Amino acid sequence: MSEKTKKTKRLDDLNFFDFDAIKLGIASPEQIMAWSHGEVKKPETINYRTLKPERDGLFCERIFGPTKDYECSCGKYRWVKYKGMQCDRCGVEITEAKVRRERMGHLELAVPVAHVWFLRKNPSRIGIMLDMRITDLERVVYYASYVVVEDCIDSVTGRTDYKKGELLTDVQVREARKKHGSRLKVDIGAPAVKKLLSDIDFDKEIPTLHVQLAETQSELERTKLIRRIKTMEEFKASGNRPEWMILSVLPVIPPDLRPLVPLDGGRFAASDLNDLYRRIINRNNRLKHIESLRAPEVMIYNEKRLLQEAVDALIENGARGKFFIGAGGRPLKSLSDVIKGKHGRFRQNLLGKRVDYSGRSVIVVGPSLKLHQCGLPKLMALELFKPFIIGELMKKEGVTLKAAKKMLERVRPEIWDILEQVTKNHPVMLNRAPTLHRLGIQAFEPVLIEGKAIQLHPLTCAAFNADFDGDQMAVHVPLSLEAQLEARTLMLATNNILSPASGRPIAAPSHDIVMGISFLTKVKLNDFGEGAVFGSMEEALMAYAYGKVSLHARIKVRGITAIKEDGMNEKDLKNVNTWKDYTTVGKIIFNNNLPEGWPYVNGAVGKKELAAIIDECYKSKKYGKYETVQLLDRIMKLGYNYATRSGLSISIADMIVPAAKQKYIDAAKKRIKEIQGQAEAGIITEGERYNKVIDIWTRVTDDVAVEQFKEMKKFEEAPYSGEGQRFNSVFLMADSGARGSRQQVRQLAGMRGLMAKPQKKLTGGQGEIIESPITSNFREGLSVLEYFISTHGGRKGLSDTALKTAEAGYLTRRLIDVAHNLVVMEEDCGTTNGVVVSSLMSGEEVVEPIEERILGRTSLEDVIVKIKKADGKEEEKTIIKEGDSITLEQSKLVKKYGVQNLRIRSVLTCESKNGVCGKCYGVSLVSGNISNVGDSVGIIAAQSIGEPGTQLTLRTFHIGGAASRMLSQSQAVAELGGKVTFKDIKVITNRFDNKICISRNGAIFVEAANGTIKEYKIQYGATLHIADKVTVEKGTLMAEWDPHSIPVLSETEGTARLTDVSEGITLQEERNKVTGVIERKITASRMGKKNPRIVIEGKGGKKVSLPLPVDTILLVENGEDVLAGDILAKIAKASGGTKDITSGLPRIAELFEARKPRNAAIMSEFAGVVSLETSPKGLVEIVVRSEETGQVKQYAVPQGKHLVVYEGDHVGVGEALTDGAIDPHDVLRVKGIKEVQEFLLNAIQEVYRLQGVTINDRHIEVIVRQMLGNVKIVDAGDTPLLKGEIVSRATLLKHNAQAEKEGKKIAVGDPILLGISKASLASDSFISAASFQETTKVLTDAAITGQVDTLQGLKENVIVGHLIPAGTGISAREFTKEFEAAKKK
């Protein structure tokens, strides 16, 4: 027996699962012949009568193997006993039919043809090798021009008349032949290219090219030479030969990979590849035939060209713009099309497979389930657990397989007991599409239920983003024991309480539950039973049960509240309204459901408070996960119970319209009339008028909303009359966070507010706001005009949703691709580098305090604070030690002692060779423990960033396009009293005796008595109301300015002369439609370079030049006398449009793709003083002169750019000199890697924060690390790298280590910022890159360089079918390695 099994195991069978790397190369003709099992000579496929494959055709059994297992074509041999024999009649080997999936054939081409990938794919590899233009190459390959294949030297003069590689037309060849005869060697078509390629000798060529590279001066020539050298060295190193890029033998892929599928009605559905192969065989055979007939050259060339085109079409149809069309007029799918794109091999079959043992059904709510359970319909479970049931039946009943299947089909009663038993401890996985993050698939224990719908626990809805309006979910059964174990320990719903994106609870109560709890814990004055004093909780609950006291009545209970408060007499005890410390029965009921020993919660409990309780419970050492799960289930039951009892319903009377609404609107209209008057008088410009109007309405809308909530709250705080409702339902829902936002309630009963206009804005932004708001609300009803205005907003929301979901999905895909191979690879990399974090500020307010940013991160230093002891002495105390993972308690101490900043470890500075280390990543956000080796932090980061993208795009339409604008700040008011200090403020007095600030980066510092200092930035042109070194009270107005425009001020007395300002060229006069005033605006000159400016000619002949950017509104006439502080012109600021995530999502994509902004700001490369000059071309030039080094740099300012610095200003390193977006590449170049990391992190977080989405910093850090993972070689040293090449940091380190070992000069690289798409394609793994984008290009490159994919990342392992190197897959790998090592010993 053992002998026999050994024989059947064929030695040439590879084990397809046991390999560590994949290498790609170019197949040589010998290699193709070695793969082949025979030549395909005929274009026939199968015989239409017998339906058997034709001999020597595309499905021939002799070449590719038998169509039926162990049966030859003619039927002489059939059965396994003849295995391995070859039939003497039909020549078919007796073997399994599945060899038809792996055996290849070949086609001898009558003439070599060029491989279209190497010829056409940019950059053309054949072109680089021969140093020929792609157009010239095509002329040769497609038989339009001849090429000289050897230098032709004139025998008389010794001159080279025709150089190798030169192109000649038909006529030129005839002429040259007359002169040179047979000395002229020319050829045409792919054979000519093949000859040229085979003549290349790398050992001679490469040194020659290096010499040329050293000598050349031209940058273009350099780039070209570097590319040639690189390609040649790649060829040499990989062992490929250049002539293999020309095919003389064509492989024919196995027939089962291009099948003919019989359809009913005797027709066949054929794979397109068969058509393409047929066309090649036909043309090849015809060419052979014509050649044997000695046909004229023209005919033969034409036929050869057709063969070349046919092979092109097989490899990549449409590569040259011409498609081969199949039946039905669609282009045929070539080999390239089969592998690329969403429906190609990579993405359709290798990365996304269909799964057996799965089902799907509609979901319904299962409020009686525990958190770890789901309701599974019995019929579904019966089908899903079939194999397990059959196994049990065979074991229990002792029946055969067949009988067990019969029993199952008839659904015998004993089967239900077995099903119960089989599903008892067998978790199933539920998944809801789209699976945007890891919580989209969770494991549950099934509870068998009647009916056909799956029951889902309400608290998991947030993670799945599920609701019960007809959503469907899929069920998957983990089969193996390991899979079950992983599902239970890693994926069970009880392990997924925290969101991996923010580390906050995601399984927190919402909607009805919050409503119920909020109702339960509310207080109502004058409710029955008020003023009762109870001896214990139980007594109070009993009184409630007997109906003696209401749920919301104010009561006192011994042990919870103070019975006698300080300074209270007996009379006060009877008067409830004097009580300060009281509780309600509802609050007692709520607190009884909290974990034992939890401090009594006596406030109102809404959504936020509940989430905080869950968070604290989960993260505290005392309670932990198990207790939190119990708590969640108790809160859910309680919430549903009291939501039902509350009898909540909304009536139109609940929507209270604030009484003061009309007063606000009238005041606003009056104010707008005044502004209109100012505009008509020409005091303010049209742009300013518009901005002011919008500002007024935005304020009014907010005021009305505030007023409305006040009135609703009043109703709640009013004493209960004994009948009717106790609370306002609308307010209860919005206030507790159960449903609806302030904005929605405002639209119901306040005023709808401003709406966005459909068309694009003149300034290029979108969402211009209509300046007359909708003053009605939905309760009063909208007028026809108002309704019409709002329709646009509503529709925009819906269409945005559809378009943007795809956009967000694509962003997630790119993020996953760039970060998938980042896994925690070691516990500690031992680095001493890190980043400094402090509280994030936006202007004056703290956006994210330091204690939130450091939570769960590893500290790089001891944090020592000074504490005052009771005796007044100070002592030092260490609150955080170096290397600590900062806990919740420690972060609270940081807040308490006011620590300003802290150095922490970060993924950005982690020094792990591949992947990151646990210490740098910090505590896992999901578990709250330090990250384990194998955590796939890259994927989690990508999901956390991508998932809200989709959510946000889906959220715009709820508000119906109501314009939300940020109110512009226009004054500096002292927030605390203290002493004033001016910094960098130059002041002049204008003709009205006002003090005007004329410095660009001035600031006022106010120092309070306790030493706190507050900084206020003062704008250029601001009016100052205080002097330097005075003391101000809190709330003093210190300065104010116009928020909508920047003035151009005269700083001295003199005469204004307008230079380069000429009507119709750089000045445009237009009459304002609304006000009828004529405005004079500076425009970009179409004719020549003009540089509009005002020159002030002062006393003593001193001249000051003030540049006027485009869109400046001119307020002075030429030759007018001006005084210091006069406003000569105004530059309008573009006002913010509506802040939609629509602008947010493209912004995030722009940052991650590291795109250069359209109008980037010019940055100063060093610190210095600014002076303004005019370049020879007439443009403004900013000159920065360093005071320390004397270094000078000029920056030309393009037309239409606004300056933000002026003559004599001081600028710092990397400070913007003009307006415009900041280009991250500039930040990297000027300020370095740390700054660009911080810039990207803050810019991305800002977009999400605007939408109220919390994402932990480290997810963005992970992606930014990947974006900065490559370097550009500046000096190659003695390494094989080339100057200007972009390689990963790991590659550079590897080459440098090798060079150091050999005592050679190492290479130097500059860090470079790549966008996520580019970074994905620059991945070291070609399998991962090919499955992302540009598949054919990636594969072409990989084949030429003979690239080896060592299968380090997740994606490539999924594709080749290995366990992924993350999580349990890593431990499996380690174990296998150790096992192999032990075996060797």
From Swiss-Prot:
One of its GO terms (biological process) is DNA-templated transcription. The RNAP catalytic core consists of 2 alpha, 1 beta, 1 beta' and 1 omega subunit. When a sigma factor is associated with the core the holoenzyme is formed, which can initiate transcription. Gene3D superfamilies: 1.10.132.30, 1.10.150.390, 1.10.1790.20, 1.10.40.90, 2.40.40.20, 2.40.50.100, RNA polymerase II, clamp domain, RNA polymerase Rpb1, domain 3. Its cofactor is Mg(2+); Zn(2+). Keywords: DNA-directed RNA polymerase, Magnesium, Metal-binding, Nucleotidyltransferase, Transcription, Transferase, Zinc. GO terms for cellular component: DNA-directed RNA polymerase complex. GO terms for molecular function: DNA binding; DNA-directed RNA polymerase activity; magnesium ion binding; zinc ion binding. Belongs to the RNA polymerase beta' chain family. Its EC number is 2.7.7.6. Binds 1 Mg(2+) ion per subunit. Mg(2+) binds at residues 467, 469, 471. SUPFAM superfamilies: beta and beta-prime subunits of DNA dependent RNA-polymerase. It comes from Elusimicrobium minutum (strain Pei191). It catalyses: RNA(n) + a ribonucleoside 5'-triphosphate = RNA(n+1) + diphosphate. This is DNA-directed RNA polymerase subunit beta'.
